[in-house]
């Protein structure tokens, strides 16, 4: 068989080119911007213009009052997840996620000293198994990691699912005397078909950190640009970006390339 009949499911590398507007913007930057600043270090919290633009886009799209202080640029969604988990957990904490899940969640969580626990799947819908979730949401859990649209199932978590999940998180947080953070991994948010819409998890639960990447939506996986968006009203909203900035420095994962943020 020819290569056109071979499908590689080992890596989510887009098979369509990036938008021509991106290429044109890069060419303009290289031709017109002063090279020293264009290729120099950006602030440890990221390029202010990029952060402001992302906040404005999220506010316009989802109706939540994001500001620059809520946005932390990262090297794709992978960097976003790793930083978000480190910011809201301590060694010995537990993190819940739902099967099936992106395999790298395991090392991301292990790197923080926390323990990943996996909620069993709910076939055939593969919406989160909320009965099992409620039972597994013990006092040790400080973070829940979700992925919608899901990799590998493609399932979009419904508004009903997110409403019920938020109610469970709110109830358990009150019971245990500490807020449980929701880290929402959303690199496929813009890639849906058949008229489907993707409910925004942060709209359902206040203590949410959204992790996004332009790798899939703009076909730019090699450029490594994403962000963490701390929901307005989230516990620690005024310090979480500072925390992730320090985590980035001390783990050697500084901000994405300056030119990509521009």
Give the ranges of each region predicted by the language model.
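N-terminal small-domain helix-loop-helix segment of the aminotransferase-like
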Residues: 1-76, 83
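Short acidic capping loops at alpha-helix termini that bridge into adjacent secondary structure
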Residues: 66-71, 91-94, 140, 178-179, ...
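Conserved PLP-anchoring active-site segment centered on the Schiff-base-forming lysine
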Residues: 87-109
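A short helix-loop-beta submotif of the ANL/AMP-binding
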Residues: 110-117
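Active-site phosphate-binding strand-loop segment of PLP-dependent enzymes
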Residues: 123-196
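Conserved core segment of the aminotransferase class I/II
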Residues: 206-262
